[in-house]
UniProtKB/Swiss-Prot annotation:
Pathway: Amino-acid biosynthesis; L-arginine biosynthesis; N(2)-acetyl-L-ornithine from L-glutamate: step 3/4. The keyword Ribosomal protein does not apply. This is N-acetyl-gamma-glutamyl-phosphate reductase. It comes from Methanocaldococcus jannaschii (strain ATCC 43067 / DSM 2661 / JAL-1 / JCM 10045 / NBRC 100440) (Methanococcus jannaschii). Coiled coil: none annotated. The gene is argC.
């Protein structure tokens, strides 16, 4: 059994890591950290984990210097990971970072969109943790930068089109997200009366996930990305509508074949040739469902993707990356059916 640690295990992504790892047969969670909750048993903070035999002796610690594991998940805020990750690296541990701190090779982009001065990248192999595009790099990495939730759904929605160079470089993404994507701390924006029966667009041209989407798509081909997110009155999920514009004369059947070939061996990407993906199909799972593939009379090709923002958009993808790094079956601890309805 491999021992793993979770730094920042009180938030939604930390809790989701614990939920998913409870069923993982090849790892044990030996350390969970929180300065605020230090000394408390895990189920005192996460009551839904009470009775899990694997966690019967698991308590929070406030001292990250005591953490010793094969791999560390850092579920910490943007800007905080870069303060602690180098120490874990120096001590020989593998790290999967769920913040945005290591997603950019060009640190000027990080500093521009996150408004944080970066402290530099450690001198180790770093991989962007989207397995469908970077599996070989992930296998060799000591540090994996887990992708953002919006970028995961957006990139997977159009990667085959960009790779095959059948669309114009202009790509427009419209995403609806659940409130859990804003984190565990309530704000005026996420307050129930402001979210309920409402749709709230935000950062309509300046969201920090825009350059992350664009830089990854540019590794496949041409891309100029526009992205607008909307906060929806749901707990989990991201539904992304990708508006692309055909540069070649291809029909719907040819496009579907391109997707089926591109993702043919990917266990967590499901292509729907007829149905339009729905959030309830992926809720609680590590799947990314892709469908739509409709072309209008002006040559606009619309593709829809659906993910659970806390699973494929965060903790599930982190565990998928861990499985790859350790040489486990990628499905280990993750292959579950969606909560529908």
């Amino acid at each position: 059994m491999k021992e793993v640690a979770i730094i920042g295990a009180t938030g939604y992504t930390g809790a989701e890591l614990l939920r998913l790892l409870a069923n993982h047969e090849k790892v044990n969670v030996t350390y969970i950290t929180s300065r605020k909750e230090a000394g408390k048993h895990v189920f005192k903070v996460h009551p839904h984990l009470k009775g899990i035999e694997k966690y019967k002796n698991l308590c929070f610690t406030g001292d990250i210097d005591k953490v010793d594991a094969y791999l560390v998940f850092t579920a910490t805020p943007h800007g905080a990971s870069m303060d602690i990750v180098p120490d874990f690296i120096e001590r020989g541990m593998k790290v999967i970072d769920l913040s945005g701190d290591y997603r950019f090779e060009d640190l000027s982009l990080y500093e521009k969109y996150y408004k944080i001065k970066h402290k530099g990248l450690p001198d180790v192999k770093i991989a962007y943790g989207l397995p469908e595009l970077h599996r070989e790099e992930i296998k060799e990495a000591q540090l994996v930068a887990n992708p953002g939730c919006f970028p995961t759904g957006a990139i997977l929605a159009v990667a085959p089109l960009v790779k095959e160079n059948i669309i114009e470089e202009r790509i427009i993404f419209d995403s609806k997200t659940g409130v859990s994507g804003a984190g565990i701390k309530p704000t005026e924006t996420t307050h129930f009366p402001n979210v309920n029966e409402n749709i709230n667009p935000y950062k309509i041209t300046t969201h920090r996930h825009t350059p992350e989407i664009e830089k990854e798509l540019k590794k496949l081909g041409k891309a100029k990305v526009s992205f607008t997110p909307h906060l929806a009155p749901i707990t989990r999920g991201i539904l992304t509508t990708a508006h692309t514009f055909l540069a070649k004369d291809v029909d719907r059947e040819e496009i579907i074949k391109i997707y089926e070939k591109f993702y043919g061996s990917e266990v967590f990407v499901r292509i729907f040739s007829e149905e339009i993906p729905k959030l309830t199909w992926v809720r609680g799972t590590n799947f990314c469902d892709i469908g739509g593939f409709e072309i209008d009379e002006h040559g606009r090709l619309v593709v829809i993707s659906a993910i659970d923002n806390l699973v494929k958009g965060a903790s599930g993808q982190a565990i998928q990356n861990m499985n790859i790094m350790f040489g486990f079956d990628e499905k280990e601890g993750l292959f579950d059916v969606g909560l529908n309805p």
